[in-house]
Swiss-Prot record:
Chief place where the protein resides: cytoplasm
GO cellular component, one term: cytoplasm
Native source organism of the sequence: Cannabis sativa (Hemp)
Annotated EC: 2.3.1.-
Protein name: Polyketide synthase 4
InterPro entries membership: Chalcone/stilbene_synt_C, Chalcone/stilbene_synt_N, Chalcone/stilbene_synthase_AS, Polyketide_synthase_type-III, Thiolase-like
Record bears the keyword Transferase: yes
Amino acid sequence: MNHLRAEGPASVLAIGTANPENILIQDEFPDYYFRVTKSEHMTQLKEKFRKICDKSMIRKRNCFLNEEHLKQNPRLVEHEMQTLDARQDMLVVEVPKLGKDACAKAIKEWGQPKSKITHLIFTSASTTDMPGADYHCAKLLGLSPSVKRVMMYQLGCYGGGTVLRIAKDIAENNKGARVLAVCCDIMACLFRGPSDSDLELLVGQAIFGDGAAAVIVGAEPDESVGERPIFELVSTGQTILPNSEGTIGGHIREAGLIFDLHKDVPMLISNNIEKCLIEAFTPIGISDWNSIFWITHPGGKAILDKVEEKLDLKKEKFVDSRHVLSEHGNMSSSTVLFVMDELRKRSLEEGKSTTGDGFEWGVLFGFGPGLTVERVVVRSVPIKY
């Protein structure tokens, strides 16, 4: 049966990203948020929220949900109103559409006919429906009805690493497979008005944005038709951090998605990340974490700061993660793929020798509910100028 398996490692062959057109400027968001939620009388809470926004290091975010939507669905702005139906009515339509936009860009960069796509993986924490966003995205793209689909719900911020892990396994175990993997989250699922007793809600309102990212993954790139690897996916791993239960979570309730984020998350990640690195890179003989490039999910400024400090990383290691956080906020599962896209584009623009900022080896990290850590050892490819 070995003839059915690919001979080489899977690679990312193309990347596409998409965001809604509506933009939220972070400096203006506290005034906007308390106005549209009819909460301007909560002056002390508004000042707390302004400080959270100021410390976020986010400049702007994209958001599907605009003021017109809120006028049409006024109950969405109330703190715990039963609005799940109204939210899902929007999201079951908009999540596949935004995912399709990212996929179309990836397919265009790939340069091959979409009939060559054999598998589709879709992940989202924004919506649950049957048939799922995978089905609707496939229909919107006009993919073959026999494309093999995988739909994953409620992974959250580590989902970008998960889709790469599964895409790698599929591509390497099915010769000729071309896997379209897409992450899409739209935060209309958790937008609601403020409450004095729910400061975690304010953090979520301050940092989350909407986005979709898609990659095409395959082994044995066919350079005769123009396929070119961007990054090789060398190995993958997933772990649940010790003593982390309940630190990151999300719960589907009648009011929508209720988000949990414990203040100890940055410390938990920074205290455990080196063990993950040692397990991943000991087989390669690497122990200097400044000698690799980093594709890190920017869950928030505090996480990046703590990891940087714990591992004594040079400031430039998280430049792409910080850029994506600044320009888009935390887009959940798709964010780390935005960082991957930013890294390869910046490497080209700055004349680096490889897609990994001039380095050969790198790591991709996603962090999310559990607290779950997803990691991928990545190998860059030389850039030909």
